Amino acid sequence: LSLLGVGALALLVCCGGCGFRFWSLSDPDHQITISPETTVFTEPLKPNGDVDFIAALDDRLSEGVTPENNAVVLLVEAFGPGEIRAENRSEFFAKLGVPALPEVGDYLIGEYAYAKELADISGQHVGDVSEAFFENRAEASSRPWTRDEFNEVAAMLERNSEALDLVVQASRRPRYYSPLIVDIEHPMLISVLLPIEQQQREGVRQLTSRAMLKLEEGDAEGAWEDLLSCHRLARRLSENWSMIGGLVSIAIDANAVESDEAYLESDAVTAD
């Protein structure tokens, strides 16, 4: 499905679910017959006989998805399970069709977490260290740079090298399916958790910085692959059903464009 199609489907599910619920509450004695004439989805059903719209949407989004073609499988390997609630992890990974990941691993470390480590080592205030580090990392995405210029940014990228490579690999996969997991106390579509979507902005920021470092060091092909990966990831994320997923997709695509311009303006890039 296209982003527009998925968004329309999600809106239909949300409105359909709300309408059905309103009807039930306004006239609890009136039972609606579940059929294609009354609702797009006719199954699965909840114990009370209502259509389980979240499960229906999840089934639709997961059609044809396997652990081998799903970008989310590699993205979770890159970022780790930390943003997935502990009580939801078994269900999340079961729906992905892969074993659950351990809490601790060689996962991508974000800018703030890395800056906090620097502050702890130096004894400086974390706010001062993080502000300077964020500025350097942002500049490192805007132009070619050397390891001597931004040595701490280079060290973070080196530490995250394998995780970033997983993000690149994920971008090459043709499908994007992140299981719809809801809070049991609030089983509504609006309460579906999005544990992987926001983390991709962190991955793209670091990939664009790595691309500019590769460009400065003469690896124009590797730099271009990192940038293309950002755009491919945005396309994959656009398959997400939610408005948040669509907005993050637009944001990471836009983040990569600035680095694209720096790449194309560089003397290291030739017509060949």
Language-model features, listed with the residues they occupy:
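Hydrophobic alpha-helical membrane-insertion segments, chiefly the h-region
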Residues: 10-21
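Aromatic-rich surface patch/π-platform used for binding flat ligands and interfaces
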Residues: 20-272
